[in-house]
């Protein structure tokens, strides 16, 4: 799932899921994370989330009226701790940084088809710092997000409806590692298919310089 040219990767043989992740990349999984159909709480009209990352902290402010379905999904994911230990697996200078594939293949499998409806454009643009769900086509948004590095107004009206904005710490977002570039198969970066099936073990082994989220928490 991509932020632009947003088709899923073509179907390819998937490596077997490791029986057990190495202790160094083990991901905490709660029972609630495995039941996406119950993560349906309505988000507040406006709320903030603080991301603690390997490069520092940044805060996102969400406005539900910008994109109600997107805001509700994000709110529930944060409450579940879904983004904890997730990697920023696709970062392209001047364009955007993408994240939101859970580090546990078990969890990823449960959410892969937990789609939410598209939100109609509500006057918000994919400007610098805007936070938006990635999509693979109409009504296919699940858990992947991106933060815009530049003005990507060309994405407006294509199903990429921003639901929030980086309120502070954009310098941290700017500093996230971008050296791997575009993901496979178009580029040399991580394969989303392999992240889904192998989780953080694959990323830590083959892309060790990626930055990651330590925690994402709701704040006042």
Predicted regions and their residues:
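Sec-dependent bacterial lipoprotein signal peptides
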Residues: 1-4
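Cyclophilin-like peptidyl-prolyl cis-trans isomerases
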Residues: 6-220
